[in-house]
Amino acid sequence: MIVIENLFIVAASGLAPAAVASIWQAVGAGSISSAKMHARIVLRLATFAGLLFSVLLVGASFLHPALYPNVGNEVLRVSFWGLLIAASVQPAKVLNSVFGNGILPSGRDTKFVLKAHLIASYLVGLPAAALFCMSLGLGAWGIFSSRALEEIIKAIVFFLRFRYSLQHKRLLGIRER
C-alpha cells in the first residue's frame, strides 16, 4: 500500500523545486508581488495534482486484488481502506510538500517548517497513533487515521503561515511592487 502511495508523492516531487526556482527568480528581480503570484500558481498546481492523485489512489485501491492475487482477503481489506484514507489526504500531502520544501523555505521560514514537522509528528501523529491503536483498539485503522490527522494539521498550519506571515515581505527588505 505504501509503495502505491509513494508513487504519487514522487510524481508531485517536482512542484517544490519549481516553487523555489520561480519564487527566487522573482525575488532576484526585486518583485515580492511576482514571487507571491508564482507561489499561488504552484499552490494551484499542487492542489490539482493532489486531487488527481486522490482519484488515482482510489482507482488503485480497487486494483489490489488483481495486483496481489496471493494475498489474503483480510490484508486486502485493510490495504483497500488504508489506500482510501491515504487518498483522502493526498491533497494535503502534496500541499505540505510544496509549502514545506518550497514556498515557506523560499521566504526564509525554514525553522518554522522544521518545528511544524516535529510538532505534527511527535506531538500529534505519534500520540494519536498510540491513542487510536492501543487505547481505542483501532489497529491499522488507527495508524492510517493518525497519519491522516498529522498531514491535515500540517497543511492547515502551513497554509495559515503562508497566508498571514510577513516572511516574504521581510525577504531582503524588498518592497511590494
Model regions: which residues?
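Short runs within selected transmembrane alpha-helices of multi-pass transporters and secretion channels
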Residues: S13-A16, A86-S106, F112-V124, A128, ...
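Small-residue-rich hydrophobic transmembrane alpha-helices
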Residues: M1-S61, V94-V113
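Short alpha-helical transmembrane segments in multi-pass integral membrane proteins
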Residues: I23-V89, F132-R177
